[in-house]
């Protein structure tokens, strides 16, 4: 394989697919030019099947529009859509205490509040990316404010409803990993010691509590001191989630001059998670595994969702950038060939989200409250940038 040519071809493919397929699909079918914001509950052909708006995706869509503008093409429509969606967020998606809703109506009336803070994290990265695109410092300051509010919600007893009764003392991987990415995004536009502290704290927790060498995995749920919890929940491995974490950590390692300890930790997470996640029979990254190889409780455990594949594409390129090891190019080739053979919809555009284990389509909708314009375009933008970095490094 001529790696340089391989990377060049993928760079062009990511840019073309993003600008001619993915972004136009959501600009035409998702962006609400009447109320602002974005619809994500779309059928295969882009027609609206539910006008409920996911607040996660208000932030995610605004982020993607600004992220594409900053890294791929200075398309003014993308910036306009980002601004429209940020305005919708500010007008409709916060309650009087600064908490964000999970879903709202088309016009922005509140529908549901949930006990976690993912809406806040996505709004924060949207504000920071828009600040980077426009130079408007007020958005950077707003991003930092939302981030600090999120930290307060997580650490102040009584603000967030507990997931379990007091007798159950567990901690989850998801919020710890996402805050690495949120803080990394905001640090691009504003300096505050809380951001670096959060990154350091999250990485330390992953290393101390969630990485379990006895199973060669990163667990989703552990005890408060990292104890292995021998239940269905405690044994769960989410390979796609762990692989996403690996590239978030590689991002930090790169920012710190390829800090060896952090780089090695990220590569270990990726390598282990690939081994758990790659389906040797059918290909692709599987949803869930049990660290003791017992039956997995989640009913979607053997399905192939869109986002673990996109995160693996990013992580394999990032691992190659970090190491120059051809093994990661071959992993990129394997995941890319499988993903692009099964997920894209050649007739109506965009990608399917949910496949059976063998790669057949489970349901054809292009979006819902959890799938929309985020993982796929983020992959294309990040992978395009990584390809450029790899090519520049090899010159």
Language-model-detected regions and their locations in the chain:
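Glycan-recognition and catalytic cores of secretory/periplasmic carbohydrate-active enzymes
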Residues: 1-395
């Amino acid at each position: 394989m001529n790696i340089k040519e391989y990377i060049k071809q993928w760079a062009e493919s990511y840019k073309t697919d993003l600008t001619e397929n993915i972004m136009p699909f959501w600009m035409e079918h998702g962006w609400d030019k009447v109320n602002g914001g974005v619809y994500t509950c779309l059928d295969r052909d882009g027609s609206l099947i539910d006008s409920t708006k996911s607040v996660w995706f208000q932030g995610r869509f605004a982020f993607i529009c600004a992220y594409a503008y900053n890294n791929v093409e200075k398309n003014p429509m993308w910036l306009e859509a980002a601004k429209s969606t940020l305005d919708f967020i500010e007008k409709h998606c916060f309650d009087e205490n600064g908490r964000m809703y999970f879903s709202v109506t088309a016009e922005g009336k509140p529908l549901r509040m949930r006990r976690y803070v993912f809406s806040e994290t996505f709004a924060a990265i949207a504000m920071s990316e828009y600040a980077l695109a426009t130079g408007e410092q007020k958005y950077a300051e707003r991003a930092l404010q939302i981030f600090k509010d999120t930290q307060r919600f997580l650490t102040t007893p009584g603000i967030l409803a507990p997931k379990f009764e007091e007798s159950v003392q567990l901690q989850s991987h998801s919020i710890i990993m996402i805050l690495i990415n949120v803080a990394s995004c905001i640090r691009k536009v504003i300096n505050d010691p809380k951001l670096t502290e959060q990154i350091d704290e999250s990485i330390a927790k992953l290393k101390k509590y969630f990485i379990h060498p006895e199973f060669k995995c990163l667990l989703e749920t552990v005890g408060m001191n990292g104890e292995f919890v021998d239940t269905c929940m405690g044994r769960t491995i989410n390979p796609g989630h762990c692989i996403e974490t690996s590239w978030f950590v590689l991002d930090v390692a790169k920012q710190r001059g390829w800090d060896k300890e952090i780089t090695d930790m990220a590569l270990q997470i990726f390598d282990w998670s690939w081994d758990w996640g790659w389906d040797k029979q059918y290909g692709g990254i599987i949803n869930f595994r049990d660290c003791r190889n017992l039956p997995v409780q989640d009913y979607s455990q053997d399905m192939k969702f869109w986002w673990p594949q996109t995160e693996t594409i990013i992580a394999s390129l990032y691992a190659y950038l970090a190491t120059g090891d051809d093994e990661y190019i071959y992993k990129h080739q394997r995941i890319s060939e499988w993903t692009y053979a099964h997920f894209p919809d050649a007739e109506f555009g965009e990608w399917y989200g949910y496949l059976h284990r063998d790669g057949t389509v489970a349901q054809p909708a292009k979006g819902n409250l959890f799938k929309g314009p985020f993982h796929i375009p983020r992959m294309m933008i990040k992978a395009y940038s990584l390809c450029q970095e790899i090519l520049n490094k090899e010159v």
